[in-house]
Amino acid sequence: MRDIALFVKDFQKGTELSNLLTNIDMHVTFAESIYDLPDQCQIGIIDLDDEKFGNVKFVSELNRHTEMMLLGYMEKITKDIQDKLKAAGCNMILPTASVVKNIPSVIREIAK
């Protein structure tokens, strides 16, 4: 079982993601900061539309202090914002509309 941290404040989206991830044998932790993470957390999923989590400073800090693969999702992806977040350490950015549908296959691929 692998550990995944969800940096998601939207209750509905968090519940959907948590259920899907639990179904593919992932251990899910809802986190508010880097200090809430399990010791061996491999993947972080970030709501990039959230004011607290969806900024270069937070992503950069998370990247600097952990060795997690960081996956983000946001409503509207622009090249400028995507480039900044990727430079800060976000490995992949998905559209919000497809994150629930695609996250199980993305996580399975990463977990190989």
Predicted features and spans:
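Output/docking surface of receiver
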Residues: 89-101
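Short, charged N-terminal beta->alpha structural module
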Residues: 1-27
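Alpha4 helix (beta4-alpha4-beta5 surface) of REC/receiver domains from two-component response regulators
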Residues: 77-91
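Conserved phosphotransfer microenvironments
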Residues: 45-62
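A short, hydrophobic beta-strand element within the central beta-sheet of small alpha/beta folds
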Residues: 68-77
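Receiver (REC) domain switch/output surface
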Residues: 103-112
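Structural motif
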Residues: 6-11, 46-50, 74-75
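Acidic, metal-coordinating helix/loop segments flanking the phosphotransfer/catalytic sites
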Residues: 31-43
